[in-house]
From Swiss-Prot:
Pathway: Protein modification; protein ubiquitination. It comes from the Eukaryota. Residues 333-343 have a biased composition (Acidic residues). Residues 2-60 are annotated as: Important for interaction with SNRNP200/BRR2. It is found in: Nucleus; Nucleus speckle. Residues 23-95, 323-343 are annotated as: Disordered. The lineage of its organism: Eukaryota, Metazoa, Chordata, Craniata, Vertebrata. The modification N-acetylalanine is found at A2. CDD domains: RING-HC_RNF113A_B (cd16539). This is E3 ubiquitin-protein ligase RNF113A. It is an enzyme of class 2 (transferase).
Amino acid sequence: MAEQLSPGKTTDQVCTFLFKKPGRKVAAGRRKRPICNQESGDSSSSSDEGNTVVRPEKKRAVHNPMIQKTRGSGKQKVAYGDLSSEEEEENKSESLGVVYKSTRSAKPVGPEDMGATAVYELDTEKERDAQAIFERSQKIQEELRGQEDDKIYRGINNYQKFMKPKDTSMGNASSGMVRKGPIRAPEHLRATVRWDYQPDICKDYKETGFCGFGDSCKFLHDRSDYKHGWQIERELDEGRYGVYEDENYEVGSDEEEIPFKCFICRQTFQNPVVTKCRHYFCESCALQHFRTTPRCYVCDQQTNGVFNPAKELIAKLEKHRAAEGGGASGFPEDPDEDPVPIT
């Protein structure tokens, strides 16, 4: 290297030093320049000598949770013919996403008794509950019966008893199952639930108040109204539950049903009459309106010219006039108008 280059030597003998810069992480995903392109650029004059085979390089896998793909190594090996027969069989088995292995048995999965002998473990342990304490106490009492007191403390539940409890009408006191206090729950519990949507109310009695079966009818004789659970849930969802409760149980009086003014003239009744649709008018107002149309002034139903005397309203008016003569009038009237004479 220290020798000087003669002018006859070519520039190909000059040695150049290349320093590779450390690549940044950002450039890891960039496409690398294939080596064959550099070789082809150096020997551009000898491009006609032969064909070059370009094989794509395997890219470096970058961990990115947003990019997911299937395994493709087997496909690449098959494409280049580098896959052996053993690897082909392994890839065939791995190509299936889910593989189930049959047990070759017709029995259901799980316990053979389908959980009928499962132990209920939410209560106190069987060896520590009240029934176990009572049974141990009974056993100790049997051992100590007929013996003298040995002055040995055996616990608060194991004091020596000199009188044996007798059976009563409530049951056997020594069995422990009829005593006061907690009773041992069954260990093996299987619940059978039946949803009964039938109200079991006698339909004939509810609609008509009469049933041909009488007291022998097995259904309930009740004429009150009930709502099923799904009806209450629907009202809760729609926001209508309990809105009209006061109106449903409100008892209306007769005075509220009978008006105190004529619907046509808006004045106090003069010879009141009532139609078939239970609307009250003055006799003159009803006849005058009938000349225009035979329909009711309030509900627009056909009256057919039938106007009956309003006996109930006349009795109310007489009652209020009598009360007014005594100094107490509860009938609402205009103060400027005189009492209506009933003819």
